[in-house]
């Protein structure tokens, strides 16, 4: 591809992911809190539900949600926010999760251990006769099972409490497809949509987040063979490079190629299920 081709695709992707050319953190916070408040009220439901991992994304989304329900209550609408801790057994960075909960200050907090359900599903697959090609493949699949079990738990609580499930996907993760389809990618509302990672951090900082939360190294921490593996190791590019791409800055050809490969390869994750009416005809 030529430089002009790269630039054209970059502009199209930025528009598709709704990344604004300019960013005012205080105005952005107010807009997102108001959006969450209006969305919940318009639905007729009463509760927001979100899993809090300890990372900056869930911490930021959680604090925005708590501010939104407080805004609704101030206006006479009964609304609550439920934060869920969803560890897989003992979480390696549990101290970070507790720090995040203290920052979010949710109305209620529930803890559900997904390990028994995730392990039981894997054991059932193995007992059925399914054979994984390698231990690494089994570990990867098991990790996605954990992510989906977490969403099952959140939707169970939402179903019982007239709730809506919040997702933490933002423009950087969406660009790279770095989420589990129907796992952490399965949610009702995405308050961080359109934000680069550095802008998520800016929002968290403006909301009063501890620097240990704001600058925590992002990790899905789903794979037991590679615990706490940083997202950037999986990407092969840094979040700063991803954010530069999203904010319309010039990046190296290697970064362009890497980003576009991830973006094109994860297109199915950003789409509704295909039907024959979506498939192009000759």
From Swiss-Prot:
Keyword Transport: no
Pathway: Cofactor biosynthesis; NAD(+) biosynthesis; NAD(+) from deamido-NAD(+) (ammonia route): step 1/1
Residues annotated for ATP binding in this entry: 51-58, 168, 197, 219
Binding residues for Mg(2+): 57, 173
Entry-linked InterPro entries: NAD/GMP_synthase (IPR022310), NAD_synthase (IPR003694), NH(3)-dep_NAD(+)_synth (IPR022926), Rossmann-like_a/b/a_fold (IPR014729)
SUPFAM superfamilies the record matches: Adenine nucleotide alpha hydrolases-like
Residues that hold deamido-NAD(+) according to the record: 148, 181, 188, 268-269
NCBIfam families: nadE, PRK00768.1
Name this polypeptide is given: NH(3)-dependent NAD(+) synthetase
Organism: Burkholderia ambifaria (strain MC40-6)
Name of the gene: nadE
